[in-house]
């Protein structure tokens, strides 16, 4: 895997590349110190009626690793897998973590309501950021699969969900900080 992880917010990535966004990004800003091993996520997905498809070269030891950085999990054999990235406040990708954290703190600084303050606290106190990257043409099944992934990290890692072009969501799934771009 290359040094550059493609997990910048959609607006920053579009501007840097000068091309339309082909992916949908969502994140969970997690306050727990460590990400759970992938095996726990896969067991959670199965308990919710999902059938996650792991990479063919992933071994059992990889499923028990807590310090993973990137993995693709499939939701349907005929569709591209959802890419999961986990960057932490320490280690090799600390700079990526800090860049993401700074970007969202700057976005939230323009809001002065209690919900934005709550989101700011979550972003500030986060120890790792779980990011999902989906193809823009993802199916409804893919959105559901992604939603279960986000819920797992939100519930198990004291996290707050953020979806690009939408905003931050409460644990009940309600939009609490609207980051949509107003239409002119």
List each language-model region with its residue ranges.
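Acidic (Asp/Glu-rich) sequence patches and key acidic residues
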Residues: 1-184
